[in-house]
């Protein structure tokens, strides 16, 4: 049982409040409605307080006694008679101050560091102002919310990184990768529905268009073993155009060993597709020229080339 305060939830329409707290003076009793002190009331008796306006809604009504602590209630030195009733009143002031100190309701605040000596502060309300103490449940809820926000941000950033990686990969697989590239234009009209095409050329990269619309490598198509694999099946009649190519290491001349190797491989593939023209022998004594002449000789022997 509390001696210096009382708290009740009063319904809407309440105007009279019963005060069950002992006090020496009515001015020591303070009235709070939902945590806000009010002076809009009058005393109708020693134990009844009437609000100037009835409560509009259910309200927590708190009465707190705050006994005068700076001055003695009875001052014998000022001429108050030293009689039983005055001695009792003075001792009552001391008793009330002790009760208020123990119950803590009248303490206006602390002005120094507080040590709980390892004990907890319990039954706290959730914070409202920026400097209010926070409960564990409030912090846990905020932490969970922050975790959700971090997860969403991480997912968003990953999606952005993946998109950037795809765009970078597509850029690296075009013909501006910083090294010399050999490339071949190629196109076809699909005779039947398919999700892959094999141009018959050696290549490691491609700029691909479907019916004139550019495609993105790693998203709408991929290249595996000189074959273009599409993300979905293309219907018959689709026009597929591409610039096929591969990066090579630049040499000192106009053609590199690697570029002629790719040319030789592709020329051989084209020959067996009956699309090669008669090609004269190359001149010179270099390794590359010898390889090309050997290829031409084999094509003539097989009857693919007429001259």
Swiss-Prot record:
Subcellular location: Virion
Coiled-coil blocks: none
Keyword Isomerase among UniProt keywords: no
Pfam families according to UniProt: Phage_T7_tail (PF03906)
Gene Ontology cellular-component annotations: virus tail
Alphabetized UniProt keyword annotations: Viral tail protein, Virion
Domain of life: Viruses
Chief location bin: virion
General function of this protein: Anchors indirectly the receptor binding (RBP) protein (depolymerase) to the virion.
Record-given protein name: Anchor protein
Native source species: Klebsiella phage KP34
């Amino acid at each position: 049982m509390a001696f210096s305060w009382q708290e009740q939830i009063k319904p809407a329409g309440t105007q009279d409040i019963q005060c069950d707290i002992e006090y020496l003076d009515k001015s020591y009793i303070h009235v709070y409605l939902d945590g806000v002190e009010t002076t809009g009331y009058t005393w109708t008796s020693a134990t009844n307080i009437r609000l100037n306006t009835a409560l509009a809604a259910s309200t927590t009504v708190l009465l707190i006694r705050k006994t005068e602590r700076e001055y003695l209630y009875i001052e014998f030195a000022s001429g108050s008679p030293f009689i039983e009733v005055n001695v009792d009143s003075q001792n009552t002031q001391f008793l009330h101050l002790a009760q208020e100190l123990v119950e803590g309701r009248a303490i206006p605040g602390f002005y120094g560091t507080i040590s709980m000596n390892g004990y907890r502060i319990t039954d706290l309300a959730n914070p409202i102002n920026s400097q209010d103490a926070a409960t564990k449940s409030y912090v846990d809820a905020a932490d969970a919310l922050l975790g959700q926000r971090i997860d969403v941000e991480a997912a968003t950033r990953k999606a952005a990184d993946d998109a950037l990686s795809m765009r970078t990969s597509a850029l690296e697989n075009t013909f501006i990768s910083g090294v010399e590239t050999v490339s071949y234009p190629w196109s076809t009209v699909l005779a039947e529905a398919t999700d892959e095409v094999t141009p018959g050329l050696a290549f490691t990269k491609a700029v691909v268009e479907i019916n004139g619309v550019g495609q993105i490598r790693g998203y709408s198509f991929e290249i595996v073993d000189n074959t273009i694999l599409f993300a979905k099946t293309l219907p018959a009649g689709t026009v597929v155009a591409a610039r096929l190519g591969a990066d090579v290491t630049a040499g000192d001349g106009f053609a590199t060993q690697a570029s002629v190797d790719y040319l030789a491989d592709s020329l051989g593939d084209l020959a067996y597709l009956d699309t090669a023209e008669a090609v004269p022998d190359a001149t010179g004594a270099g390794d590359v020229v010898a390889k090309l002449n050997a290829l031409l000789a084999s094509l003539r022997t097989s009857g693919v080339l007429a001259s």
